[in-house]
Amino acid sequence: MKHSQTKPRLLIAMRSELPEGFFGSREWARLNAITDIIPGFPHMDFDTAEGAEALAEADILLAAWGTPSLTRERLSRAPRLKMLAYAASSVRMVAPAEFWETSDILVTTAASAMAVPVAEFTYAAIIMCGKDVFRLRDEHRAERGTGVFGSRRGKSLAHLGNHARKVGIVGASRIGRLVMEMLARGKFEIAVYDPFLSAEEAASLGARKTELDELLAWSDVVSLHAPILPETHHMIGARELALMADHAIFINTARGWLVDHEALLAEALSGRLRILIDTPEPEPLPTESPFYDLPNVVLTPHIAGALGNELRALSDLAITEIERFVAGLAPLHPVHKQDMERMA
């Protein structure tokens, strides 16, 4: 965007609780230095009189969770809009298929910033689940000091621990690649399944490329990082889970879309696998779901992604993209129509 005496007008549209987490004094100062923020933010409805007026005035849209979808009709009411800066990961909800058919608006994403906490959470989950920390904590709490600590280190627990463990990564996404980089620094063997990844690329990440069935049968730990695509729906079902070894660990910090949860529940009820689910299907699970109570299941409420002060990493990147746009510089992380075929 070329410099002018008039600052571009910025529309902030996201869930009402998010600005407090996204923006501190530093972030507001950066935005005010380069844009004219449209009052009344955060706007959550582009179809009210106030929301429609704000959309019509906007040159830049700073979006996140809860931003209304930019349908063809809404785009027709946004004649000035030149940039969508998304301060989260997947832009699919804000930029649906019709957006790409009718718009040449620049789209940027903070997916690379979001990938960091998810990868950190996943790596920590691999370590913690490897030592069965959550189940042993529950047993220790119930025993209240009456248990025998020596029994925790006996031969019967050979499946516990992280020495030379074999970890299978399903999906060489941003997050999957970061997890592999973290694992490669330790004493892990790594395999990866991704039809878009070459064997050479896998090797550069410290992993070997395999087919899905081989990965499932080989791995002590399986971690999902594939995108939501028609062909990935329930890619992990009863047949695939049956390939996994007894005591293997199954981790999903991606999306419930990838897993047949009826099949996963059957395996969970058998006690054969150790399971961590951050993103179930449906989300949230119904109150009566057995997943909540099974000792071999760790269920977390979609917290692998940016949480608390981690939101500032997302807004920092989104604001950086806006600063670059206003200065006429190329974006760091643009999203194009063809990217949507493989992105989460």
Which residue stretches match the model-derived regions?
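Rossmann-like adenosine-cofactor binding region
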Residues: 69-71, 191, 195-290
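Phosphate-binding beta-alpha-beta segment of Rossmann-like dinucleotide-binding domains, i.e.
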Residues: 105, 110-166
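Rossmann-like dinucleotide-binding domain for NAD(H)/NADP(H)
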Residues: 107, 247-344
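Phosphate-coordination loops involved in phosphoryl transfer and adenosine-cofactor binding
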Residues: 7, 163-166, 247
